Regions:
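Active-site donor/metal-binding and catalytic loop motifs
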Residues: 212, 234-253, 490-508
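A recurrent flexible, glycine/aromatic-enriched loop bordering the glycosyltransferase active site
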Residues: 159-198, 430-447
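Conserved donor NDP-sugar-binding/catalytic core segment of glycosyltransferases
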Residues: 104-159, 386-392
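Glycine-rich, basic loop-to-helix element that forms the pyrophosphate-binding segment
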Residues: 65-85, 345-356
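Short beta-strand-to-loop acidic/aromatic patch adjacent to the donor-nucleotide binding site
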Residues: 88-100, 365-372
C-alpha cells in the first residue's frame, strides 16, 4: 500500500534528515511511504542536502515554494498535489520534519482504520514522546494509564519497547461531544504524525489557512471532522519522538510564539462559539476598543435575518447587556501590535473590522458598522448591493474625492500626527497613486467575507494600517488600486437617508 506523507520543511535540514532516516530505518514493504516534500523557501544548501538523501533512499515528490508561506498553506499545497497526482490512494498523511518515527509506526496507524467498516473514522494520529521533557505528553500518558509509569529510565526507545508490549486497546476514539465538553482545550490528535482517509478533504475541505503559520489549525480541522459526524482516533502503539516548535524558533522568540499560540486558540474558541449554534446566514458586527467608541442601541433591529455581535476589550461594556448585541470578550486577543503603540486601541478595533473571515466561517455575508453608526433601515434590502460580481460594497465619501484631500483634512482636524501623515503622503506619491479614485467612507462595510479575493484585500489593507496610519480611509483606495481589487461604491447620501445615520463623532463624544 502506497501512502503519501506531506512533509513541509523550512531550513533545519539536520532535523529533516534525522526524520527521513528514521522513516527509512523502519520501512515496511506492506506500507510504502511516498514523501510529498514541500519546501517553504529554504536555502539552496538546505534543499540540496535533503534532495540528495531522498534520491538515494525514499520514494518522493518535491515542491519548491519561493518563500515561506507558513505550515498550513504548505500542507494544503502538498495535499492538493497528492490528491490530484494519486487520486486512487485511500490514505494520506501529514508529518512534521522534527519527528523521529519508531518500529511499525505507520502500520499501527493504518491498523486503526481496519475495524471501521462504515468509514466513520477519518483521522488517526500517533502518540507523542516529547524530547523536551524526555517523557510522553501528559495527555498521551493519561490515555495509556498506570502501566506506563513503571518505566525506570525515561527515553524514547524504552517507551517504544514498553508500549509495544502492552496488552491494551489499539486506539482511543474521540467525537464531537469531546470538543463540546472541553471547549477546545485539547487537540486530541495533533498533526505531527497523522493519517487521513483521502475522502475527508472532498467532504469538508482542507486545513484552515486563517490560522496562518500554524497552531490550532489541527484542533480546528479535527473539530470540523467530528462536527460532520465522523470520529478521530489516537493509535496507542504508533509512537514518534517530537521536538516541537523547531521551525517557529528559527523565526520568532519564545514570547512571540506564545502570543501566536494563544491568539489562535482564542480565535478558534470565538469562531466556533459564534458559528456552531446559529442558523442565520448574515451577521452585523462591530468592535468597541478602549474608550474610542461606545455601543449604541440600534433604531432598526432584525433578529430574524441577522445575528448582532460586538467584540470588545472594555471591562465596562462586558458588564452590560445591550439589545440586540451579543458581547464577546476579546481582552486577551493578540493582534501583533505593541501595547505601547499610542494607537493600540484604535488598531485593535480595526483588526476585527478587517478580519471577519477569522470568526464568521458559516455566515455568508457580514455588515460592519463603526460604533458611532446607527441602523435606521431594512438591512435585508441592503444585502442586495452584493451580487455574483462583487464581494464588497462601501460608501463613497460625501465631501472629499481622494486620499490626498483626506490627508489634508486629517491634518486640519487633528485626526492623525503630522509625522504619520507626511510618511503616508510621500509613500503614495512614490507609488504614483492617482488623485481621482473616489475616496470611501469606511464606517460601513458590506462583504462576502469568506471570499478568497476579499480575504486577500482585507489582509493587505490591515498591513497598511499596521505600518502607516490607523486612519483606514487613508489606505483603502490605495490597496484596491495596487492589487486590482474590485468593490461597489455606494453614495453615502443614499445610505444615510435609507439605512444608516451617524450618532456621534469617534471617541465617544456627541
Amino acid at each position: 500500500m502506497k501512502i503519501n506523507l506531506i512533509l513541509p520543511t523550512y531550513e533545519n535540514e539536520d532535523l529533516t534528515l534525522k526524520c527521513l532516516r528514521s522513516i527509512k530505518k523502519y520501512l515496511d514493504k506492506n506500507y510504502e511511504p511516498n514523501i510529498i516534500w514541500v519546501d517553504n523557501g529554504s536555502s539552496e544548501k538546505s534543499k540540496n542536502q535533503i534532495l540528495k538523501y531522498l534520491k538515494s533512499n525514499l520514494s518522493f515528490d518535491n515542491i519548491y515554494l519561493e518563500c515561506n508561506v507558513g505550515f498550513i498553506k504548505a500542507v494544503n499545497i502538498g495535499l492538493k498535489f497528492a490528491l490530484e497526482k494519486y487520486p486512487k490512494n485511500k490514505f494520506i498523511g501529514i508529518i512534521n520534519n522534527d519527528i523521529e518515527v519508531s518500529n511499525d509506526w505507520l502500520k499501527n496507524l493504518i491498523d486503526c482504520f481496519k475495524d471501521d467498516v462504515d468509514d466513520k473514522v477519518q483521522c488517526v494520529g500517533s502518540l507523542c514522546y516529547d524530547s523536551n521533557i524526555n517523557d510522553l505528553t501528559q495527555f498521551d500518558k493519561r490515555l495509556i494509564g498506570d502501566e506506563i509509569n513503571n518505566i525506570s529510565e525515561h527515553n524514547f526507545i524504552e517507551y517504544v519497547n514498553k508500549i509495544s508490549n502492552l496488552n491494551c486497546q489499539k486506539y482511543v476514539e474521540f467525537n464531537y461531544s469531546n470538543f463540546k465538553k472541553d471547549n477546545f482545550t485539547y487537540t486530541y490528535v495533533p498533526y505531527y504524525s497523522v493519517i487521513f482517509r483521502t475522502s475527508i478533504f472532498q467532504k469538508i475541505g482542507f486545513l484552515n489557512e486563517n490560522y496562518n503559520l500554524g497552531y490550532a489549525d489541527d484542533t480546528e480541522f479535527n473539530y470540523r471532522i467530528c462536527e460532520n459526524g465522523f470520529t478521530i482516533r489516537k493509535a496507542i502503539k504508533s509512537i514518534v519522538n517530537h521536538i516541537g516548535k523547531s521551525t517557529f524558533k528559527l523565526l520568532y522568540d519564545e514570547n512571540k510564539i506564545f502570543n501566536i499560540q494563544e491568539s489562535n486558540r482564542k480565535q478558534l474558541r470565538i469562531s466556533k462559539m459564534l458559528n456552531q449554534d446559529s442558523l442565520k446566514k448574515n451577521v452585523i458586527y462591530t468592535c468597541i476598543s478602549g474608550n474610542y467608541d461606545r455601543l449604541i442601541e440600534l433604531s432598526n433591529v432584525d433578529t430574524k435575518n441577522f445575528d448582532y455581535i460586538c467584540f470588545t476589550n472594555s471591562d465596562l461594556l462586558l458588564e452590560k447587556n445591550i439589545f440586540p448585541w451579543k458581547i464577546i470578550n476579546v481582552k486577551d486577543f493578540n493582534i501583533d501590535i505593541d501595547l505601547s503603540d499610542t494607537d493600540y486601541y484604535v488598531k485593535f478595533a480595526r483588526f476585527f473590522k478587517l478580519h471577519p473571515h477569522l470568526f464568521f466561517e458559516k455566515y455568508e455575508k457580514s455588515i460592519w458598522i463603526d460604533g458611532n453608526i446607527n441602523v435606521i433601515g431594512n438591512l435585508s434590502e441592503y444585502l442586495n448591493f452584493l451580487n455574483d460580481f462583487n464581494y464588497l460594497a462601501i460608501p463613497i465619501h460625501p465631501f472629499r474625492n481622494n486620499i490626498y484631500e483626506e490627508i489634508f483634512a486629517c491634518n486640519r482636524l487633528g485626526k492623525e500626527t503630522n509625522e504619520k501623515l507626511n510618511i503616508i503622503n510621500k509613500f503614495l506619491i512614490n507609488e504614483n497613486f492617482p488623485r481621482n479614485t473616489n475616496l470611501v467612507q469606511s464606517g460601513v462595510l458590506l462583504r462576502k467575507h469568506n471570499n478568497d479575493k476579499c480575504i486577500f484585500m482585507m489582509n493587505k489593507w490591515w498591513e497598511m494600517i499596521k505600518n502607516y496610519s490607523k486612519r483606514d480611509q487613508l489606505s483603502f483606495n490605495y490597496v484596491f488600486w495596487k492589487y486590482g481589487g474590485k468593490y461597489l461604491g455606494i453614495p453615502w447620501d443614499l445610505l444615510s437617508k435609507t439605512y444608516f445615520t451617524t450618532n456621534y463623532r469617534h471617541g465617544g463624544t456627541k
